[in-house]
Amino acid sequence: MQGLYMEQLALVLQGLAGIVVLAPLFLLVLLCMTSLIEWKLGEKTTAWACLIAIIFGLGAAWGIVLIMLGLDQRQLVLIVGDWVAMGSYHFTIQLVFDLLSVPMVILTFLLCGIIVAFTNRYLHRESGYHRFFVFFALFLAGMVVAALAGTIEMLLVGWEMVGLSSVMLVAFFQERPQPIRNALRLWVVYRVADAALLLAVVVMHHQGETGTGHLLWGESSWPQKPAVLLPFWSWWVGLLLVIAAAGKSALLPFSGWLPRAMEGPTPSSAIFYGALSVHLGVFLLLRLGHLWESIPSLAYLLAVLGLGTALFAYLAGSVQTDIKSVLAFASLIQVGLIVAEIGVGWRYIPLAHLVGNACLRTFQFIRAPSLLHDRRRMESALGGHLPRPSEPFPLARAELRLW
């Protein structure tokens, strides 16, 4: 009876895992196909399709959480199949549900659901309404694949999907030249990060015959995962992955693209550069926490890089005149601090910091278009103009810019 019960439970887990991954992929296929055959869905239909996919994915993710709690397991690894199987070489498609991937997936579905509800009104009757949701579905699918990736090859697939959707939404307003130029600049930076990640994959493929999940992800649950690569190769692979994360998360010296990415619509700025996409590099660093523990020089580099990025973002944000740029640099300050926390050896604190920062920035970005309206309403209630912040309170002003 016990064996039959476990078999049935395994089937349930496989079904739930399939829903988590396939729901956003099905949404992407649906929106792409309707665009290709020039059969555009109505605005309400498009929004409801996105919400239904998100609800199914979120419900399945919570179902997996309940099963993990019931079994008292910290990690569930589901092997879907093989990418390549040639002789002794086989690279598997794995989905990993653990203390890092599950919070990231749930956060992704929750924030994306909020953005769908906001965008349905924000882009009402915009000519690019349907195009926005096509790239949004691509982003959602990429984030889910990257978060659940059991090997770095799978993470690379999700990584590329997120990068492509980011660039396309920066260039959303195609009638103006500046968004196109900024999107090309972002594309160049992302190509550098992608090249570093791809080189790391190539190096690791020379170290084993079973894909890179065994070499980097390890067999035990996060964050207790041993480093498997040889010390020499670990250092070079780690450096390449730091470069990849720096490009994706706008760390120094790649921070210049972040304010330029604000050319996109506010919903994409919120979910990409305030909440999720900008934290994808941080997620990669968190996933490989054991690697930094085994290489103190790279851990020190992460701490210095994170603090340097936070300082730069604070100074740059203090002179911005656009609210979206101010929020982008405020988010970058927190990203830098999270990277520094990873560098000093913390694991759960950076994860909680990531979740909190993503939620806060999403709220701030979607409130940004109403800022002037809120100020005028407050002035009307007070019967006059609001006073400007006075100089005797520099600490308070610094805290406002920081958070």
Residue ranges of model-derived segments:
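...captures the hydrophobic TM-helix bundle architecture rather than a specific catalytic motif
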Residues: Q2-W403
